[in-house]
């Protein structure tokens, strides 16, 4: 297993030589890897940015089957994941908040309190409306419509779109993992 740095979620590479694993079982190996990563081994969340490379294996004419190769692949991934020191990621959204200039300080303070990064602000002297651009974890945005209405007396609006994934801060990651373990 190797990390992918190109933004891909999953890649499978077959480097088997000499038929150690017959070609008909290679798709079962790939499927076993993908299914295991999709189930998620950290707090039940899918693992992304992973390349799985099949380097070797063995075949037995009686005992080998697609299911056996899927199960063996799944177990191999479960064995290697802890050694890879995986991290919990969270979606980060680009957020644009539109509101009258007089509310910008409170809006930026609120975004910062949500672990957001304010990237900048553009003012329009003609309209009196400003735009704050920020990047904010999705987990912090669940009540943002209500908060923005309160801050701006109903005069603010926002839009958001997915930007990237980033590592969850250590303290929050521990809380998420602990909560998942109590649900199991």
Question: What is each residue range found by the language model?
Answer:
Residues 1-184:
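Accessory interaction regions appended to the cores of large information-processing enzymes
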